[in-house]
Amino acid sequence: MSKDDCIEFEGTVSETLPNTTFRIKLENGHEVTAHISGRMRKNYIRILTGDRVKIEMTAYDLTKGRIIYRMK
C-alpha cells in the first residue's frame, strides 16, 4: 500500500495497551487503536498517556492506525 492511500489524523493518547498499542481519541471524537511505526520504534521514541500524536489510517479500516509522529 502506498503512502498516498493513507489518511492522517491528530489525536490524544487516552490509554496504553499491551504490545506498544495505544487507544487514541481523535479530534473528531472517534476512538481508534494504533501501534508505533517502525521508525519511531527504532529511534526509541516513548509515548505516554496524554501525548498528542499524529496517526495514519487506511480508508479500508478506520478502527486501526499507525502512530507516525509525537507532538512536542
Curated annotation (Swiss-Prot):
Xref: InterPro entries: NA-bd_OB-fold, RNA-binding_domain_S1_IF1, S1_domain, TIF_IF1
What is any one of the record's Gene Ontology cellular component terms? cytosol
Q: Which gene encodes it?
A: infA
Q: Which family does it belong to?
A: Belongs to the IF-1 family.
Q: Which GO terms describe its molecular function?
A: ribosome binding; rRNA binding; translation initiation factor activity
- Gene3D superfamilies, alphabetized: Nucleic acid-binding proteins
Oligomeric state and interaction partners are given as:
Component of the 30S ribosomal translation pre-initiation complex which assembles on the 30S ribosome in the order IF-2 and IF-3, IF-1 and N-formylmethionyl-tRNA(fMet); mRNA recruitment can occur at any time during PIC assembly.
**What is the annotated localization of this protein?**
Cytoplasm
The protein, known as:
Translation initiation factor IF-1
